[in-house]
Amino acid sequence: MIRKAFVMQVNPDAHEEYQRRHNPIWPELEAVLKSHGAHNYAIYLDKAHNLLFATVEIESEERWNAVASTDVCQRWWKYMTDVMPANADNSPVSSELQEVFYLP
C-alpha cells in the first residue's frame, strides 16, 4: 500500500456543513473510492486554522488519480465548492504532504 496525506481548507463558517456532508458520503462515491483501491481514508478538521488533514492508503497512484475523472467525483467536487476553496476544475485546493516518519 502507498500512504498519502494532504491538506485542504474549509471555509470558516462551514465546519458543521462539511462534517454533515461527510456523514455519510454518497454511497456511489464510497464505491468509486473503494473500487479504485482506496483504503483507510480519513479526514481530520483543525477548527482553529480551518484546515483539513486527510490520509489514505492506495493500491496504485494510477488508480487513485483515475478517481478524479469519474462522474461521481466530478459531481462531489461541484457539491463541495460552497464549503471549501476550489480550483477552476472544482477540485479542492490541496497540498500533498511528504511523509517524514512512520511507525508500522
Curated annotation (Swiss-Prot):
GO terms for cellular component: cytoplasm. It is an enzyme of class 5 (isomerase). One of its GO terms (molecular function) is L-rhamnose mutarotase activity. The active site is at H22. Substrate binds at Y18, Y41, W76, W77. SUPFAM superfamilies: Dimeric alpha+beta barrel (SSF54909). Keywords: Carbohydrate metabolism, Cytoplasm, Isomerase, Rhamnose metabolism. Pfam families: rhaM. InterPro entries: Dimeric_a/b-barrel (IPR011008), L-rhamnose_mutarotase (IPR013448), Rham/fucose_mutarotase (IPR008000). The keyword DNA-binding does not apply. Its main location: cytoplasm. It is found in: Cytoplasm. It catalyses: alpha-L-rhamnose = beta-L-rhamnose. The keyword Isomerase applies. Pathway: Carbohydrate metabolism; L-rhamnose metabolism. Its EC number is 5.1.3.32. It comes from the Bacteria. Involved in the anomeric conversion of L-rhamnose. Homodimer. Belongs to the rhamnose mutarotase family. HAMAP family: L_rham_rotase (MF_01663). This is L-rhamnose mutarotase. It comes from Escherichia coli O1:K1 / APEC. The gene is rhaM.
